[in-house]
């Protein structure tokens, strides 16, 4: 075993010879004491959790860590295949409930919950352990699959989707935390790409698998969701077994003690610990965040509703209230929250601020054009379910490939900003190319595929480089909070993008269809074309009705790309702010090298 991990026997004796366990993690204790204001400190529970993670990391052998990383890859492969499959099913599930235009609203709510669930997941991982939190996330995901499969209306489907998103987010976040626990900063760019590797294959397999389920039929899309409730728990067993075994090994060696194990405490103490945990989750902050952003974004995503004086007043009141709630959130979290849900003070660091601005605008731009892209391809271009998804997935494939490449480039040159300086112009040029060449009257897919590849390459270089930028200025104790803040900005950006997409799609597509088809079809049939993708596809290509539908879909999707281009220009603001921090194994004061026997 390497010197980085230290001798197990030496650690065992050291822990036994000291009555106070926390003395073994003096750097973390010193950081806590010198943190300054109380709401900028690392909590006692989190401090103990980080100490526990480091103690467990010291027990990894070469064999056990290989098993863990293989298990991590297997879980990532199954998760990515599921995502690529169910993405195509989603628009048919909503169409089954006559709510195809609600796609953006569902993604909007999902992105808001994405931003919120990360903080509790990180806190749970710090307090209770990586293994326990991974099991919780897995359980939520499985329950989400089953709820989606058996949903009876769009409301039940949305609630089930939220549960599913929470679980999937937990799995992804905990995978990154496990990698961070067992790697140095210099190697983390490469290792962080492990969960992304499966996308190189699943982007091609998923759409074909989705087509095989026949999602246009009611039972087809339900089966496509439900089957994963059995697959995912099975493939997660190697990773979970490896984590629990090494946790047991560390505890048996006396490398840590669980001061906050609820089983060993009386009822009053359990209640006190539950209150402490709730306080650390910043429950009030979460309520303010969810209510504020939901009230702000939902009116925009439903802009197709009939405008009346009453609805206008209600919308203005809703937006005003949401802004007040968000201002209150910022003031409360900065001034009064003992352990704020979002580490807003970290934004004082220009590298973290710039990375957050960059990832916010990137995800906003992406979600603006991507929400309805495959629907547009199926209608206007006449592509099948699998071919439309495969066309979009060339973006995902190129993004994943360049993200992996960026890890090796950061390892080779020890820099991340040069990659950001290349990625942002590349992505913007890709979006511009889609507008100029990708969407054409001849419905050729080759130009669209080429410019999607260019945009995806820019996105891949950007996402991982910006994430490493945040980690490069974060200590181990602050890593989870700062990473959560960064990912929150990505989710909020996605929520804004979905809100804009939903509003533009609902308002402009519905008005175009009504204006162009009112002399050919009754209003209820026009509404059905708008709400149900299957109705739009039921009209044969080449007929007058289908041509009108195609023109309306094309014009609306092109509008979304124009807005996406404008949003992407703001990425340059974040790029300018970020410092060029050199990467090395010393950046991270508690980084741990991969062990070897």
From Swiss-Prot:
Domain of life: Eukaryota
GO molecular function: siderophore-iron transmembrane transporter activity
UniProt keyword terms in alphabetical order: Ion transport, Iron, Iron transport, Membrane, Phosphoprotein, Transmembrane, Transmembrane helix, Transport
Major subcellular site: membrane
Family: Belongs to the major facilitator superfamily.
Gene3D superfamilies in the cross-refs: MFS general substrate transporter like domains (1.20.1250.20)
Transmembrane segments: 65-85, 97-117, 131-151, 159-179, 190-210, 225-245, 281-301, 312-332, 357-377, 390-410, 419-439, 448-468, 485-505, 558-578
Phosphoserine: modified positions: 46
GO CC terms: fungal-type vacuole membrane; plasma membrane
Role description: Involved in the transport of siderophore iron and so has a role in iron homeostasis.
Membrane topology annotation: Multi-pass membrane protein
The keyword Lipid biosynthesis appears for this protein: no
Protein name per UniProt: Siderophore iron transporter 2
UniProt subcellular location: Membrane
GO-annotated biological processes: transmembrane transport
């Amino acid at each position: 075993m390497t010197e980085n991990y230290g001798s197990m026997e030496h650690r065992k004796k050291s822990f036994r010879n000291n009555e106070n366990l926390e003395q073994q993690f003096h750097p973390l204790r010193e950081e806590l004491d010198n943190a300054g204001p109380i709401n900028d400190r690392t909590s006692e529970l989190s401090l103990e959790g980080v100490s526990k993670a480091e103690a467990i990391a010291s027990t990894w052998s070469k064999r056990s860590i290989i098993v863990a990383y293989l298990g991590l890859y297997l879980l990532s492969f199954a998760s990515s295949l599921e995502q690529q499959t169910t993405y195509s099913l989603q628009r048919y599930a909503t169409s089954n409930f006559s709510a195809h235009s609600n796609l953006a609203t569902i993604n909007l709510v999902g992105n808001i919950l994405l931003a919120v669930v990360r903080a509790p997941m990180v806190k749970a991982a710090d307090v209770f352990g990586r293994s326990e939190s991974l099991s919780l996330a897995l359980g939520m995901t499985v329950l989400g699959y089953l709820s989606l499969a058996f949903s009876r209306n769009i409301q039940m489907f949305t609630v089930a989707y939220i549960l599913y998103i929470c679980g999937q987010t937990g799995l992804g976040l905990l995978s990154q935390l496990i990698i961070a626990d067992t790697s140095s900063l210099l190697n983390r760019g490469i290792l962080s790409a492990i969960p992304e590797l499966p996308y190189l294959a699943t982007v091609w397999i998923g759409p074909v698998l989705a087509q095989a389920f026949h999602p246009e039929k009611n039972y087809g899309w339900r089966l496509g969701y439900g089957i994963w409730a059995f697959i995912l728990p099975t493939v997660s067993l190697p990773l979970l077994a490896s984590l629990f075994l090494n946790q047991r090994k560390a505890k048996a060696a006396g490398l840590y003690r669980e001061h906050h194990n609820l089983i060993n405490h009386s009822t009053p103490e359990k209640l006190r610990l539950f209150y402490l945990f709730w306080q650390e989750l910043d429950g009030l902050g979460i309520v303010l965040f969810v209510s504020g952003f939901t009230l702000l974004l939902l009116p925009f995503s439903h802009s197709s509703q009939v405008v009346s004086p009453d609805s206008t007043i209600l919308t203005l009141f809703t937006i005003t209230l949401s802004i007040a709630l968000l201002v209150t959130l910022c003031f409360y979290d900065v001034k009064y929250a003992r352990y704020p849900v979002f580490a807003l003070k970290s934004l004082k660091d220009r590298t973290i601020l710039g990375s957050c601005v960059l990832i916010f605008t990137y995800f906003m731009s992406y979600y603006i054009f991507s929400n309805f892209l495959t629907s547009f391809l199926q209608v206007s271009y006449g592509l099948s379910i699998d071919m439309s998804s495969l066309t979009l997935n060339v973006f995902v494939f190129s993004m994943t490939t360049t993200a992996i490449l960026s890890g090796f480039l950061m390892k080779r040159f020890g820099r991340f900003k040069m990659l950001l300086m290349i990625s942002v112009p590349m992505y913007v040029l890709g979006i511009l190319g889609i507008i100029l060449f990708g969407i054409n009257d001849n419905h050729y897919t080759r130009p669209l595929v080429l410019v999607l590849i260019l945009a995806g390459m820019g996105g891949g270089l950007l996402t991982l480089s910006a994430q490493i930028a945040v980690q490069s200025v974060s200590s181990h104790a602050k890593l989870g909070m700062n990473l959560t803040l960064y990912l929150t900005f990505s989710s909020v950006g996605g929520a804004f993008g979905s809100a804009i997409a939903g509003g533009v799609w609902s308002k402009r597509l519905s008005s175009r269809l009504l204006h162009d088809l009112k002399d050919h079809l009754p209003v209820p049939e026009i509404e059905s074309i708008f709400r149900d993708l299957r109705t739009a596809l039921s009209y044969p290509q080449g007929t007058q009705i289908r041509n009108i539908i195609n023109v309306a879909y094309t014009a609306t999707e092109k509008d979304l790309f124009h807005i996406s281009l404008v949003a992407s220009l703001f990425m340059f603001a974040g790029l300018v702010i970020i410092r060029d921090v050199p990467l090395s194994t010393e950046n991270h004061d508690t980084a741990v090298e991969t062990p070897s026997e």
